[in-house]
Amino acid sequence: MHGHGGYDSDFSDDEQGGGSSKKRKKTVEDELLLTKPFQKERHGKVAHKQVAADLLDREEARNRRFHLIAMDAYQRHTKFVNDYILYYGGKREDFKRLGENDKTDLDVIRENHRFLWNEEDEADMTWEKRLAKKYYDKLFKEYCIADLSRYKENKFGFRWRIEKEVISGKGQFFCGNKCCNEKEGLRSWEVNFGYTEHGEKRNALVKLRLCQECSFKLNFHHRRKEIKSTKKKSKTTPECDESPRKKSRSPPSEEASKGKDEGHSSSKKSEDSRNRNAEEEDSASDSELWKGPLPETDEKSQEEEFDDYFQDLFL
């Protein structure tokens, strides 16, 4: 029995069911109209486990990256080593590097240094050779520093000077022997230096300045070539020799008269010779003008003048 008063109807349930279905259709249509094309779907359910795991991994990676950036290189290295031992096993001694084959810049320069570089040496340049060549370019190659400790065996060692030695005057104003600081009585020597370098025999002509004692050591077996200063000699006009006095003396009156006559005659002769010389010079200059262009005189450049000046100053 449905309804009130004991009356029931077969159409009452159908009307109620039809109204609810219409409402549902309207809500679905309204939602479709109100949704935007780029709007994401609503998750009414719990997220999938894989989605949650990806979010957690991303957050953990962000935190780990932040901590690694805050560390320095050594701290990062120790952390990675500890993590490797923790997760994969092993001993800490396995991660210690051997320093037997380590080389410093000084070791590389000693292995690849050359006393003189030529074009063949610069053909195949590795980073070791470039480092040695860069050091070679900083050396001053005017005078050498010598090692005369084995002079009795006729064995000598030579090297170029560094900037500190050039500033202090070692090898130029002081003795060029590395164990001597004498600055008096220095002499310049030119030595043909024969040496073996990288299995190849070479020769080089070097200059050095030594004191008297060190010069004796250098020339202990045979004498080397000494460089002497070549100063320009000043041109001096030869003076006329005085004529010897005559033994026979004339009286003073005759000598006075003769002196006057000789003075007048010599003055006239000198004037005539001057006039003739002036005329000859004028005629020669006029004739030379028509022969051709004037010969070019070789003038010394400023660098050559400085070289001559310093050569006279230092030697």
Curated annotation (Swiss-Prot):
The modification Phosphoserine is found at S9, S12, S283, S285. Residues 236-245, 255-278 have a biased composition (Basic and acidic residues). Residues 225-235 have a biased composition (Basic residues). It comes from the Eukaryota. GO terms for cellular component: nucleus. Keywords: Acetylation, Nucleus, Phosphoprotein. This is Protein FRA10AC1 homolog.
